[in-house]
């Protein structure tokens, strides 16, 4: 099952206890089966290895602030499992450009140079979407 496989990769992190409790709940097996079936039939964003990227990049013990996004970006090569973040080299989507405008208004020009926000996550910013996966059929 796709979610179980990806959650196993969080083994040894401080998110492990939280997800162990969730995995034991009745809904989780149904959710895992649903996401696994969707990924087998459709394009799902982000790629499986990035579904839990927000948790890998920002340990629970390091969380200082949470920035919630709506759902993953749905253009090829954009979704990386961190809300608002796209790989460097990708054009910043409108929502990220708005964040950059606000940062520059507060901190001055040039403070937002990278579209990949992994460094933010490593500094305690949990960049979490309220929906972790999105299939093309829902767009």
At which residue positions do the language-model features occur?
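Active-site and ligand/interface coordination hotspots across diverse enzymes
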Residues: 1-92, 116
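Short, solvent-exposed loop/turn segments at secondary-structure junctions
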Residues: 72-74, 132-135
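A gly/proline- and charged-residue-enriched helix-loop-helix capping module
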Residues: 91-108
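Short helix-to-loop capping/linker segments positioned immediately adjacent to catalytic or ligand/cofactor-binding
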Residues: 106-118
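A residue-level signal for beta-strand positions that form part of recognition/binding surfaces
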Residues: 124
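Conserved small/polar residues in nucleotide/adenosyl-binding loops
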Residues: 137-139
């Amino acid at each position: 099952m796709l979610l179980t496989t990806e959650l196993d990769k969080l083994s040894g992190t401080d998110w492990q206890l939280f997800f162990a409790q969730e995995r034991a709940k009745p809904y989780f097996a149904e959710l895992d089966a649903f996401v696994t079936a969707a990924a087998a039939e459709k394009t799902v964003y982000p790629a499986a290895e990035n579904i839990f990227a927000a948790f890998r990049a920002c340990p629970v013990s390091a969380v200082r602030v949470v920035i919630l996004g709506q759902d993953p970006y749905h253009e090829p090569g954009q979704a990386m499992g961190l809300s608002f973040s796209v790989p460097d080299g990708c054009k910043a989507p409108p929502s990220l450009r708005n964040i950059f405008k606000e940062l520059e208004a507060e901190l001055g020009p040039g403070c937002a140079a990278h579209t990949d926000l992994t460094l933010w996550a490593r500094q305690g910013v949990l960049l979490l979407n309220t929906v972790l996966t999105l299939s093309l059929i829902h767009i």
